[in-house]
Curated annotation (Swiss-Prot):
Summary of the function given for this chain in its UniProt record: Specifically methylates the pseudouridine at position 1915 (m3Psi1915) in 23S rRNA.
Main location: cytoplasm
Catalytic activity, EC: 2.1.1.177
Enzyme class: transferase
Protein localization: Cytoplasm
Protein name: Ribosomal RNA large subunit methyltransferase H
Subunit comment: Homodimer.
Reaction it catalyzes: pseudouridine(1915) in 23S rRNA + S-adenosyl-L-methionine = N(3)-methylpseudouridine(1915) in 23S rRNA + S-adenosyl-L-homocysteine + H(+)
Residues binding S-adenosyl-L-methionine: L73, G105, L124, S125, Q126, M127, T128, F129
NCBIfam families the record matches: PRK00103.2-4
Length: 157
């Protein structure tokens, strides 16, 4: 199985980017992982929230194939403990999915078209984080999930 994380806009903070790169490298020992950044939409100030979501949605959907399984990182998604999340990763791997695609949307969430294509929504927390920080937190949780599956000493109960 491959895992792809799609996010809108580049990571501006160099310190965050360094940590994202570190966990991406660590994750590559367990699974093929791609972080795909969609460029910020130009002239966003001239768009309504709905128009911005629709434009971002078109770009997101252009990055997936019909066989990809799409899961959204969404504030209204289901929350998991790290162990339960690792169990979900194992189930997805066992199911024969070729590519599992997680998406971090823009500031206003996702378009209706993106929601229609999703296989689920997960939330990292009831708290709100910047979208740039969510990238780091989520990639770290992927890494943690695989260390749990391999019984490696990264995660402590």
């Amino acid at each position: 199985m491959n895992i792809k994380l799609i996010a809108i806009g580049k990571t501006d903070n160099k310190n965050l980017q360094t940590l994202i790169d570190d966990y991406t490298k660590r994750l590559s020992f367990y699974i093929k992982f791609d972080l795909e950044i969609i460029a910020d939409i130009k002239n966003v100030k001239n768009l309504s929230e709905t128009q911005q979501k629709e434009k971002e949605g078109e770009l997101i959907l252009s990055k997936i194939t019909p066989t990809d399984q799409l899961i959204l990182l969404d504030e209204n998604g289901k929350t998991f403990s790290s162990v339960a999340f690792s169990d979900q990763l194992q189930k997805k791997m066992n199911s024969g999915i070729k590519t599992l695609v997680f998406v971090i949307g823009g500031p206003y969430g996702f378009s209706d078209d993106v929601y229609k294509k999703t296989f689920g929504k997960i939330s990292l927390s009831q708290m709100t984080f910047s979208h740039q920080m969510v990238r780091l937190f989520f990639i770290e949780q992927l890494y943690r999930g695989f260390t749990i599956l391999k019984n490696e000493p990264y995660h402590h109960q």
